Amino acid sequence: MIVTLKDGSKKEYAEAKSVIDIAYDISEGLARAACAGEVNGEVVDLRTVIDSDCELNILTAKDEKGLAVLRHTASHVLAQAVQTLFPDAKVAIGPSIDTGFYYDFDCPPFSRDDLDAIEKEMKKIIKKGAKIERFTKSREDAIAYFQEKNEPYKVELIEDLPEGSEISFYSQGDWTDLCAGPHLMSVKGVKAFKLLSSSSAYWRGSEKNAMLTRIYGTAYASKDELKEHLEQMEEAKRRDHNKLGREMKIFTTVDVIGQGLPLIMPNGVIMMQELQRWIEDEEAKRGYIRTKTPLMAKSDLYKISGHWDHYKEGMFVLGDEETDKEVFALRPMTCPFQYYVYKAEQHSYRDLPLRYGETSTLFRNEDSGEMHGLTRVRQFTISEGHLIVRPDQMVKEFKDCIALAQYCLQVLGVEEDVTYHLSKWDPNNKEKYIGDAEVWNQTEAHIRQMLEELNIPFTEDVGEAAFYGPKVDINAKNVYGKEDTMITIQWDALLAEQFDMYYIDENGEKQRPYIIHRTSMGCYERTLAWLIEKYAGMFPTWLCPEQVRVIPISEKFHDYAAKVEAQLKENGIRCSVDQRSEKMGYKIREARLARVPYMLIVGAKEEEEGKVSVRSRYLGDEGMKDLDEFLTSIKEEIKNKTIRKIEVQEENK
């Protein structure tokens, strides 16, 4: 057999070989570092035997997929340690994730002392160095095995698998888990790890299920890499919008209001209004027409669109179909409403494209276990829009939507922080979608070609499309590495028929338009969270809730400070005066901690000369300036939405 390696070189063998044997044949160093193999694109155990021609990549912890295998094994060591120390704990699931791993247990919550004890037990298990072995059982035997061990969550997972399935297990010493793998050869491969936290999580993410206790951890190939990661985690905690956004009085949450329903505080409202005005102005420049549509509709509307069949579980339904004459639902999106704006009058081919935009409030019934700060909420605001176009206009208009999204990202200073994804349908799960394979394949091909023509790197994600069409998702990671979708642009060749939308062509015949579903900037709440974490609260001046703080050096200069404040406000600058009887150093520090970009210090000399002493987060002490000079510069900075570089590091503390 011939094994083709990642670098294109080939190895020829007369008999079957395991992945680890081939790794040793390449180099002993590679074999010692190996975590798994990738055979024809599938990640497998190192013990997997290869008996035919294939492509092989030996994965180490330097590879994302190899590191995931190491972390998956670490999660099994964690579960073994927990059940050693807490024998009554029931195990649920324990996958690797982007930043490490977790394992869910049915048991009381863990304290930090508990986590420290579990870490010690994990080190004992690793020191013993048990080999990891894979074996299989029939579905019936697997169920019986876990029933005997009183592990109900494992039983439920197996019962969800088809009858006749072969069920794989992994054992390390005297501890065994249900698992598809792959795993390391031995627990000794888990050399550097840390348990980070414990929290609650619903079984399978649904609040209808049992509340479990989750332990998060991370693992790396070396202690140096682990140390670097833990330092990054400390910085992430400092930037976490869920903490910083509350400290900056941008938003808060209240138990009696409910999860996923944040209160946007005055500072947050200022920022959202700035973003909204800017987005609406940019859309107006590009020919968008504003609409304002209802927050809810009868179920009839969603039955026409297909949302009732494909998305009902994600909607807030008001009423009972069996007992009520009319059932309503809060809208999860704006599209079917804007279709009726279009249908309210007849349109010629000359009228198209029509670009409808709306700053919409939407509602989605997310599981409470998914709620997090401003990134995952049940009510949110979005810059939504729908373009009704002729088929021959589709490519240009779609590219223009991408260009608008890229412009918005560039202005916000986050264009380098995103990834692009072509979200496709899953042809093996056709019941999730409307339309036939030909339409789906054609539209996906169009989007693929556009992204290539625009030189945009992208990945293709099967099964991530909306039920009515493929889309471009522009994603970003939060400070903890979790990826969220920020902006979506969708190609829809199907819903116009569902709603009997048409235009009159040059021959007087009715024709179906195409539809582009898009956002310019996406969800405002999620964007706020993104910006808080990106800038650690030190936003570009145009977005700052407070742009200038006037600080008189003593009470006798309060009147002059008030005059300066009045002039600033007349020029549209958001400002305040600190009239407290505190030391100047304290006032300056307080303004800095409040992340105010500019402080204007006023005293005898400033009042006498009609000037202000400028202190900025960017350059520190900028000296004394005429107020008009300062006004000109800050107004220009705000108008241009300039992102100034912070030159003085102590101002950033």
What are these regions (language model features)?
Residues 1-90, 97-653:
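NTP/phosphate- and nucleic-acid-binding module
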